[in-house]
Amino acid sequence: MVLSEEARDLLADLPMHRRQTFELRLQQWGPDLLDAVTALYASPDEVASALVTIAARGFAARSDELHRLDERRLLQPDWFQRPNMFGYACYVDRYASTLKGMGDRLDHLTDLGVTYLHMMPLLKPRPGDNDGGYAVMDFSSVREDLGTNEDLAELATTLRSRGISSVVDLVLNHVAREHDWAVAARAGDAKYRDYFLIYPERDTPDRFERTLPEVFPDFAPGSFTEVDGEWVWTTFNEWQWDLNWANPAVLLEFAEIVVHLANLGIEVLRLDAIAFLWKRLGTNCQNQPEVHAVTQALRATCRLTAPATLFKAEAIVGPRDLMPYLGEGRHAGRVSDIAYHNSLMVHVWSMLASGSTDLARHALAGLPPTPPGGTWVTYVRCHDDIGWAIDDSDASARGVTGVGHRQFLADWYSGEFDGSWAEGLVFQHNKETGDRRISGTAAALTGLGPSRKDVAGGFARIFLAHAVVAAWGGIPVVWSGDEIGSPGDSDWASEDGHSADNRWVHRPRMTDSDRARRFEQGSDAQRVFDGIALIARVRAGLPMLHSEAPTRVLTDADIDDGLLVVQRRHPSGTFVGVFNVTGEHRPLARARLTDLGSGDPREVLSGHDLAEHGLDDPDGMLWVPPYAAWWIV
């Protein structure tokens, strides 16, 4: 590709080395950009030229400090894959009221070991109910109650000075109906009507809906909303209008938004609802091939302006559909850098409820490794409900049914199953499929909920769950409140706009007093916080937990069903994770550790002396304590 005249003019006043830098980037990423738009649009050269112009404008406006950040990241392309990466996710208003307040309350995070901070939707949403901030009416402005764009840029700079990368949501699939584009479309502006999917009659929506699943069957059934006698595509809620990504003007608009956020200093953009972007009749309109071409076009544009900014795909999809979001085939190394390991999260909860690792071993061992330049976000809880994404074929391969196991998990974590320690809430019961998702904090789902059904077990399960996800490589992310053992917000329904959405139970506000409780010896907050901080601290010193080292899940029949055993090989040595998901001692053959490369094994996480657990016993059997998490090197 060559620079357009307009792009040359935008770069003309820059120093020679800057102009040369942009031209070198165009040589590197220009072919990716052109390839992507060629797969999408009828006039690819025109679209590609417009994207390069957007990138050049952003490059010329980018600050010197951010240009230096770009150079540092290009010299350390694996910076986000290193074992010192440890994440935290929160709503700014619920953690610190404002962006300035966030900057004043970072000690809590640095003490935890955080190097990656995901601040939940903070761009201006519609007033009233807004899906937790995911119904955006202005992508160019921060929520007024949180602060200003300048406050966000200042916070991003402060975070960088403390070794923390900032992460912000970018909702790609839809906008609020109050967004200027939607307002203009509703007023009849032909240009903006083509930004959306609007049908004059019901026939086409009916044909689509034959194969479309419902996202919110309880309070937003269907995928279309009648507006002024026409039908608008609204996958999530009637006030969230799906965008028409087949229109290149939408791509250009979002390229401008990506560059704007990158120039505020945001280091990771979480691409929300990315799986839903492209619509195709006769499908579920998720995971369509064009989604990856759209991502590639946006990523290439961003790399021209701000290669320090990464993409994270929020694709909560089945395990077989997940890997393309990190890049496969023609898109390898060209789409998102990070994706959510939803399957790992689901199977952690499945193992704890069932006391069995059999299904998890089979499912997790069957996933291909991440591409060399990609990594996972691993997590125990997040802002959302838990959907029981148990693959039917995985379940049947292990002698159970997917429907039956999903039913069991919903029963267990809602507390309906006899003997359950959990106190979750059922979210979105789909009466047609029987699926029931679950809301609740980590504490509420492990025995430390309001009724404190199993205090000792709860502490052990919280530590174990976080130790598992932190041992998988990638970026483990802790959900706000879970690090202090919050049982949840008992008054979640009393806030305006929250009463119909029980996910707010696991989105509690955190006060300075709440944070201070971690200093009270023996408190829930102290015990949970210190445990998770220990995980982060030990992890940072283990090169075997670099993302490029693959995780091997052992599926051998001679390994006890209550133990999950994983191995990670790295030039610096071998890591073996041993996790007991039961409340009983479980045996592990000493020879297993030798076979896995641990000739002189040391447990470095929990402080367990393996000799006290049978390391040297004549029978050659180690006994792993209840809910133990062993990191062995």
Residue ranges and their predicted role:
Residues 1-633:
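Active-site and adjacent substrate-binding regions of carbohydrate-active enzymes
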